[in-house]
């Protein structure tokens, strides 16, 4: 009989504490302690990156909860791809709307396995006055972004959170992801433009630092790989480190083979399916693929 990875959870549920690791507890974000846990003060001071699950996802929840009750916050724009039925993210957005703030949620109703749940959450938020947008008919809105606009010293100032993982507090305890908090004007302007695009208010404009998929991401990644190939051929330092959910795209795989053959050292961190064959002589001998992070 084949055993799926999910079946292993039944083994873990056995009462054999000596065979198990101690429960892992995410550490608090040290940066916030310097600012009495005031997310906006911390972001205003300097951008910071949070590494989940080693650092707690609570910082993302706190960021939205503080926005929901902050009298200076005038608007929140949020993407929702996958979350929980009792999500504190949803509660924060509805609380913000109840407090009279302009709240927009881009909810993806084509998220696999969560279609029904996302529709129910969208209806719940809409009843509280959250403006709901369902994204594009032919595409999945997979971006993970949150934009908060505050009125400061008579002007509007933007704050942004972007991440590699969903706004899903439970998964964030076991999924390895990165969060960026920033008030950088160029990045904030990019995220504003992307939300305007997703909500149908404007066509996509030229972006400063954010790369949008599908229009531009492939070309950007190819250009970056080409640059490493060029460096390797000139005997300059080169290397590629890529983290992704899966790798099945034939063109991207061919490009990575090309880089490996040119002498570029490549490390791939791939959670799921990987169609690239590492370690093949004269093809992919410079490529290492890792899938599991363990203790």
Please place each PLM-identified region on the residue numbering.
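Glycine/threonine-rich ATP-lid/beta-loop region of ATP-binding domains
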Residues: 250-253, 257
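Short, catalytically relevant binding-site loops at active-site mouths
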Residues: 247-249, 273-276
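Short, flexible helix-loop junctions that flank or precede catalytic/ligand sites
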Residues: 243
């Amino acid at each position: 009989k084949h055993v799926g990875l999910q079946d292993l959870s039944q083994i873990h549920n056995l009462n054999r504490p000596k065979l198990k690791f101690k429960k892992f507890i995410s550490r608090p974000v040290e940066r916030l302690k310097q600012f009495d846990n005031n997310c906006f003060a911390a972001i205003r001071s300097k951008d910071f990156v949070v590494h989940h699950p080693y650092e707690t996802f609570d910082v993302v929840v706190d960021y939205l909860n503080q926005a929901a009750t902050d009298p200076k916050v005038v608007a929140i724009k949020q993407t929702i791809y996958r979350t929980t039925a009792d999500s504190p993210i949803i509660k924060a957005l509805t609380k913000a709307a109840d407090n009279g703030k302009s709240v927009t949620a881009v909810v993806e109703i084509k998220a696999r396995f969560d279609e029904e749940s996302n529709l129910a959450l969208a209806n719940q938020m809409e009843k509280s006055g959250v403006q709901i947008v369902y994204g594009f008919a032919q595409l999945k809105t997979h971006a993970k972004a949150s934009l908060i606009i505050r009125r400061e010293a008579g002007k509007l100032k933007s704050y942004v959170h972007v991440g590699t993982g969903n706004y899903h507090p439970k998964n964030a305890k076991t999924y390895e992801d990165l969060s960026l908090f920033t008030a950088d004007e160029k990045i904030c302007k990019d995220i504003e433009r992307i939300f305007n695009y997703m909500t149908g208010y404007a066509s996509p404009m030229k972006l400063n630092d954010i790369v949008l998929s599908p229009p531009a991401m492939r070309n950007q990644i190819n250009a970056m790989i080409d640059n490493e190939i060029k460096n390797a051929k000139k005997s300059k330092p080169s290397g590629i480190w890529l983290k992704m959910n899966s790798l099945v795209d034939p063109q991207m795989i061919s490009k990575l083979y090309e880089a490996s053959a040119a002498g570029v050292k490549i490390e791939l961190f791939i959670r799921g399916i990987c169609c690239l064959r590492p370690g093949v002589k004269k093809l992919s001998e410079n490529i290492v693929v890792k899938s599991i992070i363990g203790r």
